[in-house]
Amino acid sequence: MILKNKRMLKIGICVGILGLSITSLEAFTGESLQVEAKEKTGQVKHKNQATHKEFSQLEKKFDARLGVYAIDTGTNQTISYRPNERFAFASTYKALAAGVLLQQNSIDSLNEVITYTKEDLVDYSPVTEKHVDTGMKLGEIAEAAVRSSDNTAGNILFNKIGGPKGYEKALRHMGDRITMSNRFETELNEAIPGDIRDTSTAKAIATNLKAFTVGNALPAEKRKILTEWMKGNATGDKLIRAGIPTDWVVGDKSGAGSYGTRNDIAVVWPPNSAPIIVLISSKDEKEAIYNDQLIAEATKVIVKGS
C-alpha cells in the first residue's frame, strides 16, 4: 500500500507540472484527476466494506466480539472494526506503561535496583520470582513485564508511575480521554462485560502505541529501548506474528483475561514502512476459552486489505 501511494504521488506531481507547463491541457487533466479520485474513493469504500465483512465472519466463526484498529503510519490510512468499543486491555498495558516509565525517567535510572518481597509476588511472575533475594534493575523489570508478561513486574511498573491512576493520568496528558485504569495485577484481568474498569478501545490503544513507538512521545533513544523490548516478546508467536509475512518485523504485547479475552497490540515494520496494528477480542461467557487463531486470521485480513 505504501509503495502504491508513493507511485501515485509521483504521478500526481508529474501531472501537476504538466498542467502548469501546458495550459491547453488544464481542463482535460482536471477532469481526469476528478474521475480518478472518484474511482479511488470507490475502491477504498469497497475495500473497507470487504474487510468489514471478513471481520464480521470471523466473529461468527469464533463466537467472539472483535475490535480492530490498524494505522499505516506512512499514509495515515486506517483499517478498523468496532474501533470505539470498549475491551479489557489486560496485559497489553505493560507496553504502554513501560513507555510512560521511559517518558518519566532517565535512561540511567533503568540501572536502579528495585527490591521486593515474596509477598509482593502475584500469579504468573516467571522472571521476578527468581530474583526475590537480589532484586532486579528497573530496566530488567520493565523488560520482564513487556517480554514475558510478568505480572509482578507489571505491578512494579505501576508503582513507579503512580499506580493505575498515575498511568491513566499520563495517557490523559497524551490526549487519551478513553482509557480507564483502576486496578493492579491480577484483578485488572477480570474483564466482566459492561464493567469499564481497566478498559480502552482499539483506536485509543493504537494512538498511544503509535505515539510511543514511532511518534514524539519519546526521544529516539528511548523509543529504541521500548521497541526492542517489544520485538523480544516471548508470548505472541501465535498472534499477530502468525498472520504476517515472514520478512516483516514485529514488536508486540499480548494480553489475556476472563470472558475469553485475548489481545495483541503490535508495531509492525514491513519493508519501507511502520504501520501500527491493534487487535482486541473478547467473548461474553466467563468460561469461554480464547482462540489465538482469531488474532492471526484477523491480522491476515489487515495485511490483505492494506
Swiss-Prot record:
Show which residues constitute the signal peptide.
1-27
Report which reactions are catalysed by this protein: a beta-lactam + H2O = a substituted beta-amino acid
Gene3D superfamilies documented for this protein: DD-peptidase/beta-lactamase superfamily
- Give the top-level enzyme category: hydrolase
The record, for Pfam families, names: Beta-lactamase2 (PF13354)
The UniProt entry's GO biological process terms, in alphabetical order, are: beta-lactam antibiotic catabolic process; response to antibiotic
The family note in this entry says: Belongs to the class-A beta-lactamase family.
Instruction: Report what the protein is called.
Output: Beta-lactamase 1
Organism lineage: Bacteria, Bacillati, Bacillota, Bacilli, Bacillales
